[in-house]
Amino acid sequence: MDRRTKIVCTLGPAVASKDAIRRLVEDGMDVARLNFSHGEHADHEQNYKWVREATDETGRAVGILADLQGPKIRLGRFLDGATVWETGETVRITVDDVEGTHDRVSTTYKNLAQDAKPGDRLLVDDGKVGLICREVDGNDVVCEVTEGGPVSNNKGVSLPGMDISVPALSEKDIADLRFALKLGVDFIALSFVRSPADVDLVHEVMDEVGRRVPVIAKLEKPEAVDALESIVLAFDAIMVARGDLGVEVPLEQVPLVQKRAIQIARENAKPVIVATQMLDSMIENSRPTRAEASDVANAVLDGADAVMLSGETSIGVDPHNVVRTMSRIVQHAETDGHVPPLNHIPRTKRGVISYSARDIAERLNARALVAFTTSGDTARRVARLHSHLPLLVFTPDAAVRSQLALTWGAETFLCREVTSTDEMMKVVDESLLAMDSYQRDDMMVVVAGTPPGVSGNTNMIHVHLLGEDVRR
């Protein structure tokens, strides 16, 4: 595989057909994102089916990610649908259910008057409009407009620095989570994570449904930045969701949060996605800005497992051009750039084995690293090292293969169950010698666990020549 960093594409009206989704797969989409902030369950179900059909037809492993809306706080509705707040004006945000006027509008967050205090900031529509609380008057929060602009029905409201009392999962999120699990998605992304304990609520619902899949923590809140290391440990992967993050924390901090998050995720062998406005201008244009190209390349050079497209593919004028453009930028960054080495000394058996396998393969100038895995853990531990060698991953579990679509560099093969090391090598020979890329006697460094099939039991490195008789 020429490109090692994976691409996540958000599905939406711009690609709402089987042919369009198949073309995304052919263009290079590795993970399809179902955004539950928009669309009906029927829309997501249809897109899910089209992705699975496309993967069956093309043979590519593509994961499917269900992104939950989270407890998003919004304004209510205006009598006229919209208004313009001018800087210096006084407006009231109320917890009462009222039809909004220019001077007073409701909010979906019914504890606002209880939680707000003078001096707190309220940011509307991703920070385009700024307010500051001057006083709390009964059920109303009286605000001065510090940065004016247009506001309209149901615009989002961010409350940076305010200690808000909302659950990690709304009723809508729970319903969407149940639906997505029954549908068969490969990942769940949890929005507005504040604490490592937030994952427990998701697991409770998963256990009720009877199906667990990896949970991705979206870094959007200051609390998540403060608890970053413990959140990385608790969750299965993380997403640096720079849109809401850039509203909730000072904008100048976002690049360093991104770099720190990627570093911590790599140290813990957890996949990390960099998201939001990566090629945003391509929603309307055929070419990205130079700054956007640099942004994508820098995410690659930071060591991200994946980069994500949002509106660019869901509502953009040419989603296929966007994916191809991102793929070219990524490939060039990988070819001519340099990802800093992981300066992390492994302390576990699995970590030491993975490091050693990489070192042996590179010192012997092997053709590839090969990982056998039942859970994906072995592959992720090797992938985080970003070797220049191909990483070929064999698994008997179709779900694990789909989940590894998010892991840097993992080229996956679905194989039969094996019961011995000899069988492993036979599977490698059968699969790779059938490809034009590999020849008999090519050296492979295989990392796996014995006995095979035991999750988390990485304990073996085997230097194998393709086609050799492994029996002694």
What name fits each language-model region?
Residues 1-472:
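Non-catalytic helical/linker scaffolds that mediate oligomerization, partner binding
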